[in-house]
């Protein structure tokens, strides 16, 4: 589905970009729709995070581990053959990749997992739970738990376990207990629901490392802030590489953490277009897609008000994507807000378009992107023909595709 965004669609004030509010709202989205038993834990987490960012020693430890353990900063790489491929008579899109796939564990997810593990230790919590879809957040969480000697339980849908058997083994090898979720569609939504149930029952001893910019306040802000290192590095690297900020930022969106990490430091730089790409699955006009912003309506899921895929009765519908990490019927509340005020644009691409993009990037650049990331690459087919001048485009290469090889092998005729 091609975006119809134009500059005149922007109708925000500066206050709209200073989010969330004290009540945890991004405009009308966000909030805390949770049982009373969780409210003290959410308040404790909000206070711990606020105090931690003011603590020089905490920030120094986080930055030291991001450098020596995660491997930051990640490179900004110019994809010259991809640039040549998308060159038109009107314009040359210079395409740059923010290489989050080169992080320890192979994706952006460890930025947040590491930060939240340090918060858990600060709060005296020894037991960690997390949900995972593609397995990357599960692997990242299991990794930091191994590093700090924390007990780790990962909830994962049975369907995703079939798709991501390699990551399941990695989590177990790292010492985590992987709990299979068979309820509902047995995918990310259901794994998240089970993790929240666990947290309600064990809130005194347990910290829930939520993996996306979704869930009740303060999670959307906390996850965003730990991932904002992506965009902060990108700002500096763009100035070093070509002397200005990029014209366009491009990222895939499921729950939306990798996109928010890239977008957030640029939100007030209103000359920079922010484009998120959702999973259209078999097509947005079918019932097999995960294009929440494109086709969703306002509702409440997992403690937050946001755009959701739901029927006329408000029942959450099944999402579908070949990518386990995008197979989610909701989206982070800040994305819903940025869409509503016109600051960000969102489109969607199908499973087949993502597969074709994965193959193209692999052949042209020698980089096998994750299926999630491939959705962002696929948007270049729609975006580049519309460009009227030479344009710097930064794509968040959010993860590597090793985990997806079996899925891709059964889908592509190579």
UniProtKB/Swiss-Prot annotation:
SUPFAM superfamilies: Tryptophan synthase beta subunit-like PLP-dependent enzymes (SSF53686). The beta subunit is responsible for the synthesis of L-tryptophan from indole and L-serine. Residues 1-27 are annotated as: Disordered. It catalyses: (1S,2R)-1-C-(indol-3-yl)glycerol 3-phosphate + L-serine = D-glyceraldehyde 3-phosphate + L-tryptophan + H2O. GO terms for molecular function: tryptophan synthase activity. GO terms for cellular component: cytoplasm. Pathway: Amino-acid biosynthesis; L-tryptophan biosynthesis; L-tryptophan from chorismate: step 5/5. InterPro entries: Trp_synth_b_CS, Trp_synth_beta, Trp_synth_beta/beta-like, TrpB-like_PALP, TrpB-like_PALP_sf. The keyword Lyase applies. This is Tryptophan synthase beta chain. Residues 1-26 have a biased composition (Basic and acidic residues). Keywords: Amino-acid biosynthesis, Aromatic amino acid biosynthesis, Lyase, Pyridoxal phosphate, Tryptophan biosynthesis. Pfam families: PALP. Belongs to the TrpB family.
């Amino acid at each position: 589905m091609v975006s119809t965004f134009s500059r005149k669609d922007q109708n925000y004030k500066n206050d709209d970009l200073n989010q969330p509010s004290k009540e945890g709202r991004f405009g009308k989205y966000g909030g805390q729709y949770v049982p009373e038993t969780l409210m003290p834990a959410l308040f404790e987490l909000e206070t711990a995070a606020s105090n931690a960012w003011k603590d020089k020693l905490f920030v120094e430890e986080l930055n030291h581990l991001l450098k020596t353990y995660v491997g930051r900063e990640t490179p900004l790489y110019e994809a010259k053959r991809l640039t040549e491929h998308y060159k038109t008579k009107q314009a040359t899109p210079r395409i740059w990749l923010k290489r989050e796939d080169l992080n320890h564990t192979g994706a952006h997810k460890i930025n947040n997992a590491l930060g939240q593990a340090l918060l858990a230790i600060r709060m005296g919590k020894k037991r960690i739970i997390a949900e995972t879809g593609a397995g990357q957040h599960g692997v990242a969480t299991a990794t930091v738990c191994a590093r700090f000697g924390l007990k780790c339980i990962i909830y994962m849908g049975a369907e995703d376990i079939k798709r991501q058997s390699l990551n399941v083994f990695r989590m177990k090898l790292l010492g985590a207990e992987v709990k299979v979720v068979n309820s509902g569609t047995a995918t990310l939504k259901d794994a998240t629901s089970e993790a929240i149930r666990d947290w309600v029952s064990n809130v005194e001893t347990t910290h829930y490392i939520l993996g996306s910019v979704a869930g009740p306040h303060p999670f959307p802000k906390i996850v965003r802030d730990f991932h904002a290192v992506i965009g902060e590095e990108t700002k500096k690297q763009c100035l070093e590489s070509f002397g200005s900020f990029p014209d366009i930022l491009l990222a895939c969106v499921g729950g939306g953490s990798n996109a928010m990490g890239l977008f957030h430091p640029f939100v007030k730089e209103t000359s920079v277009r922010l484009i998120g790409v959702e999973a259209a699955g078999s097509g947005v006009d079918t019932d097999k897609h995960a294009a929440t912003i494109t086709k969703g309506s306002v509702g409440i899921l997992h403690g937050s008000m946001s755009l959701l895929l739901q029927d006329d009765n408000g029942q959450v519908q099944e999402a579908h994507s070949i990518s386990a990490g995008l197979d989610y019927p909701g989206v982070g509340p800040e994305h819903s807000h940025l869409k509503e005020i016109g600051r960000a644009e969102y489109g969607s691409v199908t499973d087949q378009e993502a597969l074709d993009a994965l193959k193209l990037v692999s052949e042209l650049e020698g980089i096998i992107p994750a299926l999630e990331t491939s959705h962002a690459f696929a948007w270049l087919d729609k975006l580049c023909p519309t460009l009227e001048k030479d344009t710097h485009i930064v794509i968040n290469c959010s993860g590597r595709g090793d985990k997806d090889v079996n899925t891709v092998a059964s889908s592509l005729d190579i």
